[in-house]
Curated annotation (Swiss-Prot):
GO terms for cellular component: cytosolic small ribosomal subunit. One of the primary rRNA binding proteins, it binds directly to 16S rRNA where it helps nucleate assembly of the platform of the 30S subunit by binding and bridging several RNA helices of the 16S rRNA. Forms an intersubunit bridge (bridge B4) with the 23S rRNA of the 50S subunit in the ribosome. InterPro entries: Ribosomal_uS15 (IPR000589), Ribosomal_uS15_bac-type (IPR005290), uS15_NS1_RNA-bd_sf (IPR009068). It comes from Borreliella afzelii (strain PKo). One of its GO terms (biological process) is translation. The keyword Ribonucleoprotein applies. This is Small ribosomal subunit protein uS15. PANTHER family: RIBOSOMAL PROTEIN S15, BACTERIAL AND ORGANELLAR, SMALL RIBOSOMAL SUBUNIT PROTEIN US15M. PROSITE patterns: RIBOSOMAL_S15.
Length: 88
């Protein structure tokens, strides 16, 4: 999992201020970090089906947040996906 220091780094990078953990951009960035971690975990542990299910759940959650963010603020959405390196 992502440790506390990595989460704080993501929050400070994508948030409006240091304690901004609830904004959509920060949530998407945190979920992306967890997805990257689980992807690497599943490359090593191919038969870990519960982690695979959790990964698919996170991907769906991120997708819905991205759709919401695209409708809410298109320019910030484009900046976020380019910063995170997501395809869209």
């Amino acid at each position: 999992m992502i440790d506390k220091k990595q989460k704080q780094k993501i929050v400070s990078e994508f948030g409006k201020n240091e304690g901004d953990t609830g904004s959509v951009g920060v949530q998407i960035a945190l979920i992306t970090g967890r997805i990257k971690y689980l992807t690497e975990h599943l490359k090593i542990n191919k038969k870990d089906h519960s982690s695979k299910r959790g990964l698919l759940k996170l991907v769906g959650q991120r997708r819905s947040l991205l759709q919401y963010y695209q409708k809410k603020d298109l320019e910030a959405y484009r900046a976020l996906i380019s910063k995170l390196g997501l395809r869209k």
